[in-house]
């Protein structure tokens, strides 16, 4: 069969044969097979051209996707699947991209962790979760995480949280809040506890007392509608204790309050 036309159509080329068959191919395919109008090709050569065109198109799509930022194997695979590239072609494309180091899950994980240490605020557990969602194996994740020390980051995040909550919570509640916030960000309890111990927390007794009285007023308005006497004091004591206030401080303000 003979090639009767090769015509550029945006990013692809339309190739027509004298048996009326048409197919879209990439410029790489034309160069690879040195195709030209009037060229005779066999059925076997046509099949090879079709396979290569699909591979070349898939690779071009992947490179376009990678041109914006680094991607994992899973991200590239999902992108090609959404663009109807066949599974066997996707495997070929990924093998080619990995060989040329366009896709490297280990390198991606390393960069992801470094970026978080420089500008992020997440601990190892959250990073593991995020990298796992991106399709990176647990082995690679663990090996890359083991290369980094999160002490400085944990301390930095703890300092930031302290600035946010200090003066707004009683001492015990402040400690609980800081520890829980650090754990929620993916740091281990041990890391959170150590970071908390590194903090320079100034106890402002006057502020603590002011917070306690303010909370007592709030709880009194709530419970005095239903309770009085001993029952009211018990309700207030329990409510204030749940807020993180010390029992001795609660007893002291209740004596002044009633």
UniProtKB/Swiss-Prot annotation:
- A Gene Ontology biological process term: regulation of DNA repair
Principal subcellular localization: cytoplasm
Q: What is this protein called?
A: Regulatory protein RecX
Cellular component GO terms, alphabetically? cytoplasm
Sorted keywords for this record are: Cytoplasm
Write the gene name. Answer: recX
User: Pfam families from the xrefs?
Assistant: RecX_HTH1, RecX_HTH2, RecX_HTH3
Q: Which cell locations does it reside in?
A: Cytoplasm
Q: What does this protein do?
A: Modulates RecA activity.
Q: Which family does it belong to?
A: Belongs to the RecX family.
- Top-level taxon of origin: Bacteria
State the InterPro entries in the record: RecX_HTH_1st, RecX_HTH_2nd, RecX_HTH_3rd, Regulatory_RecX, WH-like_DNA-bd_sf
């Amino acid at each position: 069969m003979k090639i009767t036309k090769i015509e550029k159509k945006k990013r692809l080329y339309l190739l027509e044969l004298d048996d009326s068959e048409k197919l879209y191919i990439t410029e790489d395919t034309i160069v690879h097979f040195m195709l030209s109008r009037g060229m005779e090709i066999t059925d076997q050569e046509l099949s090879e051209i079709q396979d290569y065109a699909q591979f070349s198109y898939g690779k071009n799509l992947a490179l376009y996707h990678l041109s914006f930022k680094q991607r994992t194997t899973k991200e590239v695979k999902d992108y090609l699947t959404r663009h109807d590239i066949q599974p066997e072609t996707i495997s070929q494309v990924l093998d080619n991209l990995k060989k040329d180091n366009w896709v490297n899950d280990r390198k991606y994980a390393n960069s992801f962790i470094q970026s978080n240490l420089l500008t992020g605020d997440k601990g190892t557990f959250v990073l593991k979760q995020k990298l796992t969602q991106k399709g990176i194996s647990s082995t690679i994740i663990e090996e890359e995480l083991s290369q980094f020390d999160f002490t400085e980051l944990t301390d930095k995040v703890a300092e930031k949280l302290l600035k946010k909550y200090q003066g707004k919570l009683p001492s015990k509640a402040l400690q609980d809040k800081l520890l829980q916030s650090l754990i929620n960000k993916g740091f281990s309890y041990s890391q959170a506890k150590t970071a908390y111990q590194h903090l320079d927390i100034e106890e402002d007794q006057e502020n603590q007392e002011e917070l306690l009285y303010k909370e007592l007023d709030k709880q009194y308005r709530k419970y005095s509608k239903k309770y009085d006497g001993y029952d009211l004091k018990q309700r207030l004591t329990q409510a204030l204790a749940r807020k993180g206030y010390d029992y001795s401080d609660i007893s002291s303000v209740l004596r002044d309050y009633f």
